[in-house]
UniProtKB/Swiss-Prot annotation:
GO molecular function: proton transmembrane transporter activity
Keywords annotated in UniProt: Acetylation, ATP synthesis, CF(0), Hydrogen ion transport, Ion transport, Membrane, Mitochondrion, Mitochondrion inner membrane, Transport
GO biological process: proton motive force-driven ATP synthesis
One of the Pfam families matching this protein, by short name: ATP-synt_G
Organism: Bos taurus (Bovine)
Task of the protein: Subunit g, of the mitochondrial membrane ATP synthase complex (F(1)F(0) ATP synthase or Complex V) that produces ATP from ADP in the presence of a proton gradient across the membrane which is generated by electron transport complexes of the respiratory chain. ATP synthase complex consist of a soluble F(1) head domain - the catalytic core - and a membrane F(1) domain - the membrane proton channel. These two domains are linked by a central stalk rotating inside the F(1) region and a stationary peripheral stalk.
Protein name: ATP synthase F(0) complex subunit g, mitochondrial
UniProt subcellular location: Mitochondrion; Mitochondrion inner membrane
Amino acid sequence: MAEFVRNLAEKAPALVNAAVTYSKPRLATFWYYAKVELVPPTPAEIPTAIQSLKKIINSAKTGSFKQLTVKEALLNGLVATEVWMWFYVGEIIGKRGIIGYDV
């Protein structure tokens, strides 16, 4: 057991250095996209979002959504699933747990 700990202690700096070297460019890429994609909408973008929502509601009323191609329907489903999952991530963060609320 002592030999295992000694070997681990000897290899730890090299492992940490390799992990940092591997992670640094990926973390930079993540921060770039996080700053660009995760910003809240500006006041100028809100009317566009409302207009888009009105178009979706109108297509549901008139039945024009039946004219979508398979690719468009699949992409719309993926976007809806992404929004739904981000809602659940927010719920998990808010609850500070995966299951249930502390009552």
